[in-house]
């Protein structure tokens, strides 16, 4: 099927202002606001809780690695569930699993059980995977020319909860202490409640299911009869020159495009998780309070999501490949700033982490739009889940490796290395653009 035919068969043929797309985005926005708090709560104190229970910082990156390892497995499962049963079933299952993981972290902290803690961290990662998978649901019914903005609208909704979460660390810690729970486990109480609420919202309100509706529309468009041309139209057409051939991507080009989209998101996630994970530890070692680290992480998470509308507009306006290059440059700048500012400078670290969040936003939105456009509906959710599996594994590697890099070298080395690593997307862009396209007569499918 050509890109033109696929576009015609997809929701682009629907009315310009699609009420079902508008409803879908509104429901997703509500769920993302809730789940954002769960997403950010564990990020801020996960490493600190593990360091406190293990009495060493050498494994401080392990919680992020376990979050993302669990996220990797959940991404695949949520993608498969969505492919078969729709987004509603897949996303709801993922959020409820994340809520169970949050409860497990709290129990492990109370019992001082490190093994249970690590298992719970992995289960908690399902919420992270689901939060990211929701962006695909926002694009299911969107027209191809507005997919970047649809993705970014869902992502930006996460900001409210994601920024509030880290800043509630102190409040939730005091609340937990009053209940006899270790203060560092307090944010996971918030995370569990937030994930559970998001799951309930999606199960109750995400009707009709956007992916199932998109498939139904595509099938109806494919079966719709073509109106016969009149005799006058036939005669007029016969006197015209044949239409120009349509240049469509070969299977190789489609595979390379999927590879490029995946690489953009893999590098973006790996670099972001590595630097973000060790920043609270770096700040604590230089005398900053936990609340101060929470502020820096709040800036970072805010910049991950608040610029999403800009990232979406840039992607729709200039194309995902150019925005991916901008993402790599921004991540490099983030690494340089984070490495070179004095450890005592809260403002400097906030700027570095803010740039890190912006680079992540540019990379994720551009990669998502590129992937969604290149994959047909019949295998879209499964392919998206597989790509998100690779993205989560990259985050796991970044989180796990970050602790060892800082322990054996320095935070500055980690930040610089991450910034340089982001530039690896450039040769992949060159490689993806080399595959030939096949030419077919206009109007063929």
Question: What is the role of each PLM region?
Answer:
Residues 169-170, 192-219, 428-432:
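C-terminal membrane-cytosol helix-exit motif in multi-pass small-molecule transporters
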Residues 321-367:
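C-terminal transmembrane helical hairpin of 12-TM major facilitator-type secondary transporters
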Residues 46, 129-143, 362-375:
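Intracellular juxtamembrane helix-capping segments at the cytosolic ends
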Residues 18-48, 122, 254-271, 354:
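Pair of pore-lining "gating" transmembrane helices in MFS-fold secondary transporters
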Residues 96-111, 330-343:
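C-terminal ends and interior cores of transmembrane alpha-helices
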Residues 33, 114-129, 348-362:
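Hydrophobic core of transmembrane alpha-helices in multi-pass small-molecule transporters
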Residues 74-86, 173, 307-320, 406:
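Helix-to-loop junctions at the C-terminal end of transmembrane segments
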Residues 144, 153-204:
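Helix-loop-helix hairpin linking two adjacent transmembrane segments in secondary transporters
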């Amino acid at each position: 099927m050509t890109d033109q035919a696929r576009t015609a068969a997809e929701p682009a043929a629907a009315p310009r202002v699609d009420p079902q797309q508008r409803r879908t985005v509104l429901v997703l926005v509500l769920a993302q606001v809730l789940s954002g708090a769960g997403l950010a709560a564990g990020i801020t104190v996960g490493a600190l809780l593990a360091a406190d229970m293990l009495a060493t910082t050498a494994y401080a990156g392990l919680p992020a690695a376990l979050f993302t390892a669990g996220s990797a497995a959940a991404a695949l499962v949520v993608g498969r569930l969505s492919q078969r049963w729709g987004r509603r079933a897949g996303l709801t299952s993922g959020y409820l699993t994340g809520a169970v993981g949050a409860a497990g972290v709290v129990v492990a902290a109370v019992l001082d059980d490190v093994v249970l803690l690590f298992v719970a961290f992995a289960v908690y990662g399902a919420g992270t995977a689901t939060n990211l998978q929701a962006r695909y649901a926002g694009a299911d019914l969107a027209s191809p020319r507005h997919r970047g903005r649809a993705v970014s609208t869902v992502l930006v909704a996460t900001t409210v909860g994601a920024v509030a979460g880290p800043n509630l660390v102190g409040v939730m810690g005091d609340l937990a202490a009053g209940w006899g729970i270790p203060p560092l486990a307090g944010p996971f109480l918030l995370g569990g409640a937030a994930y559970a609420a998001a799951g309930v919202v999606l199960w109750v309100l995400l009707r009709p299911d956007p992916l199932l509706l998109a498939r139904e529309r595509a099938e109806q468009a494919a079966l719709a009869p073509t109106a016969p041309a009149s005799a006058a139209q036939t005669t007029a057409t016969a006197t015209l020159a044949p239409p120009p051939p349509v240049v469509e991507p070969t299977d190789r080009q489609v595979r390379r495009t999927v590879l490029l989209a995946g690489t953009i998101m893999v590098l973006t996630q790996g670099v972001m998780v590595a630097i973000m994970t060790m920043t609270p530890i770096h700040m604590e070692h230089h005398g900053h309070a936990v609340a101060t680290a929470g502020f820096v992480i709040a800036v970072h998470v805010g910049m991950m999501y608040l610029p999403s509308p800009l990232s979406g507009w840039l992607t729709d306006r200039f194309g995902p490949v150019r925005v991916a290059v901008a993402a790599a440059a921004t991540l490099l700048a983030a690494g340089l700033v984070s490495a070179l500012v004095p450890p005592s400078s809260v403002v400097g670290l906030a700027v570095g982490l803010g740039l890190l969040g912006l680079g992540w936003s540019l990379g994720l939105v551009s990669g998502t739009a590129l992937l969604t456009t290149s994959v047909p509906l019949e295998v879209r959710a499964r392919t998206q889940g597989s790509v998100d599996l690779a993205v989560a594994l990259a985050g796991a590697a970044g989180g796990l490796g970050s602790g060892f890099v800082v322990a054996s070298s320095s935070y500055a080395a980690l930040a610089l290395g991450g910034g340089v690593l982001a530039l690896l997307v450039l040769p992949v862009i060159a490689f993806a653009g080399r595959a030939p396209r096949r030419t077919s007569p206009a109007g063929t499918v």
